[in-house]
């Protein structure tokens, strides 16, 4: 019975070497999931935006064992903005946003590789397409200014197995974009309309992403680590067999 118990414990310990979730230089990390954007505007902003979400995809390349560079993009989605003084139902425009971003990431190396926290700092480029004026501004020419802004990131992967992890990612940015409205005489205001209206966005959104993560090891280093693991596993098994024989 004692021999059987020792053998079972040893088998579990050697099986713990069956996969390697540690990240190293040359590895690729792919993430895909859904991102929720929580708009946050400054108090003096005249416009607001409803919360929305979109599918997103990113990939990271590990330049060192701890430092990686990530590129993220999402599927374009239509977004509505409204006049804050008139409420969410008072939509004044809609547009489609493309906001790819790149971040430099630092991956911490905890002893428990099943939990991989990281932080990041990067840039987000926002361009806007198919702008359309709505409501009281219908008929006018509505345009949003492109912007390049800093973005801050934190998150973690929770490892399910060697290839797949669950990911939570949070990003914070402050956009420098603004909006302008011209040709206001074409709206219901007619000849009494001002020549131009400018809006400062003052938006400081927070994004929260829930993702699946796939880890792809550097083939050469993966073979080296696998060979080392096999040698260690073999050594452990020999020690276990010797311990059983000595009982």
Place the predicted regions along the sequence by residue.
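Sec-dependent N-terminal signal peptides
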Residues: 4-12
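Short loop/turn motifs that connect adjacent beta-strands in outer-membrane beta-barrel proteins
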Residues: 19-27, 66, 109-116, 160-163, ...
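Transmembrane beta-barrel strands of outer-membrane/channel proteins
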Residues: 30-36, 71-75, 119-125, 156, ...
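Residues that define the transmembrane beta-barrel architecture of outer-membrane proteins
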Residues: 26, 51-55, 94-100, 115, ...
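Gram-negative (and chloroplast) outer-membrane scaffold detector with strong preference
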Residues: 61-135, 203-216
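Short glycine/proline- and aromatic-enriched beta-strand/turn motifs that initiate or cap beta-hairpins
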Residues: 17-60, 207-222, 242-247
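Outer-membrane beta-barrel translocator domains and adjoining extracellular loop/strand segments
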Residues: 41-50, 80-88, 129-138, 179-186
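Predominantly the C-terminal beta-signal and adjacent terminal strand-loop region
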Residues: 78-82, 94, 161-247
């Amino acid at each position: 019975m004692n021999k059987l118990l020792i053998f079972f414990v040893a088998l579990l310990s050697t099986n713990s070497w069956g996969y390697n979730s540690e990240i190293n230089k040359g590895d690729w990390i792919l993430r895909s999931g859904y991102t929720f954007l929580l708009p946050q505007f400054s108090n003096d902003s005249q416009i607001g935006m409803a919360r929305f979400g979109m599918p997103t995809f990113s990939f990271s390349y590990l330049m060192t064992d701890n430092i990686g560079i990530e590129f993220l993009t999402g599927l374009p989605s239509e977004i509505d903005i409204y006049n804050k003084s008139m409420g969410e139902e008072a939509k004044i425009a809609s547009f489609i946003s493309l906001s790819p971003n790149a971040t430099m990431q630092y991956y911490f190396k905890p002893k428990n590789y099943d939990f991989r926290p990281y932080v990041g700092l990067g840039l987000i480029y926002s361009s806007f397409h198919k702008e359309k004026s709505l409501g009281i501004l219908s008929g006018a020419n509505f345009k949003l200014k492109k912007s390049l802004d800093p973005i801050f990131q934190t998150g973690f992967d929770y490892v399910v197995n060697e290839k797949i992890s669950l990911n939570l990612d949070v990003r914070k940015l402050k956009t420098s974009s603004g909006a302008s409205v011209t040709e206001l005489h074409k709206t219901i205001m007619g000849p009494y309309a001002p020549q131009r209206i400018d809006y400062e966005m003052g938006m400081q959104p927070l994004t929260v992403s829930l993702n699946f993560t796939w880890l792809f090891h550097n083939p050469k280093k993966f073979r080296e680590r696998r060979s080392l693991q096999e040698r260690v596993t073999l050594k452990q098994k020999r020690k276990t067999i010797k311990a059983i024989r000595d009982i």
